[in-house]
Amino acid sequence: MRAVVQRVSQASVTVGDEVVGAIGQGLLILLGIGVGDSEAEARLLAEKTANLRIFADEEGRFNRSLLDIGGEALVVSQFTLYADTRRGRRPSFSDAAPPEIAAPLVDVFAGELRRLGVAVSTGRFGAMMRVALVNDGPVTILLDSAIFREPRNQH
């Protein structure tokens, strides 16, 4: 499971002419579900995201989390995070989970954020969406649940 986490002052997602999700200060989370991902990974990634200290404290240091600031989250499914561009010029998405697996896991991720106390808005799974955001920083972090299982580099 992969997430591109962007700190924002506001963000919204529109399908057609309808705004289906909007937030103020918080995180825009583009979430990709991979083949073999599970509910456990969705919960782990949600917990990591909610507690990631990427908001500034009074001294300007990254010491506050989404939970600490009472921020919101906008979760947008994004299968293209699993693009394989090693061959040719057209990306392959064979590592992305099929919709019948991915959609429920996106719901588990969003549900876990809510359980942790985060106000969550979402995009619409499988729809063509327009995402608007105002980056704050900018701060953009890539999270990959596969990396959480590996030991940290000793360099």
UniProtKB/Swiss-Prot annotation:
GO CC annotations on file: cytoplasm
- Which InterPro entries does this entry report, sorted A to Z? Daa-tRNA_deacyls_DTD, DTD-like_sf
- Please give the catalytic activity noted in the UniProt record: glycyl-tRNA(Ala) + H2O = tRNA(Ala) + glycine + H(+); a D-aminoacyl-tRNA + H2O = a tRNA + a D-alpha-amino acid + H(+)
Q: Alphabetically list the UniProt keywords.
A: Cytoplasm, Hydrolase, RNA-binding, tRNA-binding
GO MF annotation: an example: Gly-tRNA(Ala) deacylase activity
Please give a single GO biological process term from the UniProt record: D-amino acid catabolic process
Location of the motif Gly-cisPro motif, important for rejection of L-amino acids: 137-138
Q: Which CDD domains match?
A: Dtyr_deacylase (cd00563)
Q: Which Gene3D superfamilies match?
A: D-tyrosyl-tRNA(Tyr) deacylase
Q: Where does it primarily localize?
A: cytoplasm
Domain of life of the organism in this record? Bacteria
Chain's role? An aminoacyl-tRNA editing enzyme that deacylates mischarged D-aminoacyl-tRNAs. Also deacylates mischarged glycyl-tRNA(Ala), protecting cells against glycine mischarging by AlaRS. Acts via tRNA-based rather than protein-based catalysis; rejects L-amino acids rather than detecting D-amino acids in the active site. By recycling D-aminoacyl-tRNA to D-amino acids and free tRNA molecules, this enzyme counteracts the toxicity associated with the formation of D-aminoacyl-tRNA entities in vivo and helps enforce protein L-homochirality.
- Tell me the protein family, please: Belongs to the DTD family.
Question: Subunit structure, per the record?
Answer: Homodimer.
Q: What is known of its domains?
A: A Gly-cisPro motif from one monomer fits into the active site of the other monomer to allow specific chiral rejection of L-amino acids.
PANTHER family referenced in this protein's UniProt entry, alphabetically: D-AMINOACYL-TRNA DEACYLASE 1, D-TYROSYL-TRNA TYR DEACYLASE
Protein's name in the database: D-aminoacyl-tRNA deacylase
Organism from which the protein derives: Roseiflexus sp. (strain RS-1)
